[in-house]
C-alpha cells in the first residue's frame, strides 16, 4: 500500500496499491548474495518465550498453542531512507511500542527497502547499509521485548542500478535474493520473526509469480520459489509469507502454484481493502477459506479509505471465525482516509483506527 506519508519520490500520492520498472545476470546475483551474507555481523537473538511456527494450517507458539498474528503495519522504513528523511520515519522507542501494545497489538509488519538494507544504488550511508540494518534490528528487538511478533516485508525494490523508490510488479532477480539472504541471515536465530517475501505482486501470471520471468519492462522478476530458496539456504526456518496476485488480493490459484518449502513453513498472504475486488464475505468464502483449510492465512494489510470501520469490522468478524490473522494498515499519523490508524504517535486512533482498537480490546488481547 502506498499512502500520503510514503509516496514514491517524484510521484503524486495514490491510495490504491502501487507498483509499476535490464536484468544484470546471474553473476551479479551471485556476487550480491555473497556480499549480503557477509554484510550482516551477528544475528538478532531470539526473545525468550516468543516464537511462532506453522503447524498444518495453523500458526502456533513455542508451547504448540494456536496463535493468530493480530496487529498493524508500521510504514516508514520502506521510503524514508530513499527520500533522505531518516530510516524509520517516526519513533521506535519503548514508549511508542507501548502505545501499540495498549491496543492489544501482538504483531507488527515492518515494510523494508532492499536498496537501503543492502546499501546499494546510491542510498546515502547515513540512511542505508550498516546503519539501516542496525536500526531495523534494534526496532525488532524493542518490539520482541514487548511481546510483539514482527513480520519483515520486502516492500520497495527496483532492478539493476535503479533506486528503489516504489513497488514493482514483482521482486527483482537482481537484488531480491540477496536481500532475503541477508535478512534471513540476520534473523535466523529469532523465532519471533516472520518473512513476507514480496508485498503486492500484480500484473504477472501465476507461473511468473512462482518461477520468475522476464517482465515487459525488460528485467527479470524473481519468483516466490527463488525467494523461499534464498531464505532457506541461510538455515533460517521461520515462516515465510507468499502474498497472492492482484496486489495480494487474489488467492484464487495460490494452492495450485504455491512454492515448495522444505521447512514446511509456508503461509499465504492476503491484502484486503474496501476498494479491491475481493472485498465481500462471498469472495472470502470462495477464495480465501479454501486456502485457510490447507495453510495459515495472514491478511498482512487490512484497511478502508472512508474514515470508517464498517468494512474492516466485517472482515475481522469473518476472519475470527475462519482462523485468519490480520494487521491493519497503517500505524502512522495521517488522515484516516490514507488509511491511517492513528492521528498521533501516542496511539490516539482515527475514526477508522477506532474499529481495530475496539475489536482487539473486545477480544481481551494482552495489554488491554
Model regions and ranges:
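Extracellular glycoside hydrolase catalytic/binding regions
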Residues: 51, 85, 89, 168, ...
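N-terminal secretory signal peptides that target proteins for export/translocation
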Residues: 1-22
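N-terminal carbohydrate-binding accessory modules
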Residues: 43-107, 126
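Bacterial N-terminal signal peptides
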Residues: 26-39
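A mature extracytoplasmic/lumenal domain signature
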Residues: 73, 112-114, 154-156, 199, ...
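Aromatic-lined substrate-binding rim segments of carbohydrate-active enzymes
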Residues: 89-158, 220, 231-234, 311-323
